[in-house]
Swiss-Prot record:
It is found in: Cytoplasm, Nucleoid. Residues 5-51, 77-120 form the SpoVT-AbrB domain. It comes from Cupriavidus pinatubonensis (strain JMP 134 / LMG 1197). This is Transcriptional regulator MraZ. Pfam families: MraZ. Forms oligomers. GO terms for biological process: negative regulation of DNA-templated transcription initiation. GO terms for cellular component: cytoplasm; nucleoid. Gene3D superfamilies: Transcriptional regulator MraZ domain (3.40.1550.20). The gene is mraZ. Belongs to the MraZ family. Its main location: cytoplasm.
């Protein structure tokens, strides 16, 4: 399970260094192989390959009225491998789709990660907190 937020920088080639606390798990779970794709909220999803295969099967099984969402998730997917330094290359098309420049946030979301432009994430987080908790969380015990 992946959790926690990491403020990271992309290098000049568009590579993101995976924090050391997640590298070993990605090596064990997926031999360093990951898949990146677009998310409708404006970030990227980063899956260990076995988790991606499960997600891909669920998306592929969606009915025809979700055909555009299949295109968005599956058509934009890029399989990549961590290099020896624990970096992942994010393709220019995916960097552009998520408006990733230099400063990014990597968020552990359980079985996968989200990759956000740092400024976009900060603005969306502030907006969500200003709106208050959704009904589903109002009776949640912290």
């Amino acid at each position: 399970m992946f959790q926690g937020a990491s403020a990271l920088s992309l290098d000049a080639k568009g590579r993101m260094s995976i924090p050391s606390r997640h590298r070993e798990a990605l090596q064990q779970q997926a031999e360093g192989r990951v898949t990146l794709t677009k998310h409708p909220d404006g970030c990227l999803l980063l899956f260990p390959r076995p988790e991606w295969e499960s997600f891909r099967q669920r998306i592929a099984a969606l009915p025809m009225d979700a055909h555009w969402w299949k295109r968005i998730f599956l058509g934009n997917a890029a399989d990549v491998e961590m290099d020896g330094a624990g970096r992942v290359l994010i393709a220019p098309e995916l960097r552009g789709a998520a408006m990733l420049d230099k400063e990014v946030m990597l968020l552990g979301m359980g079985s996968h990660f989200e990759v956000w432009d740092a400024a976009t994430y900060a603005a969306k987080e502030q907006q969500a907190m200003a709106q208050g908790m959704p009904e589903a969380l109002k009776n949640f015990s912290f």
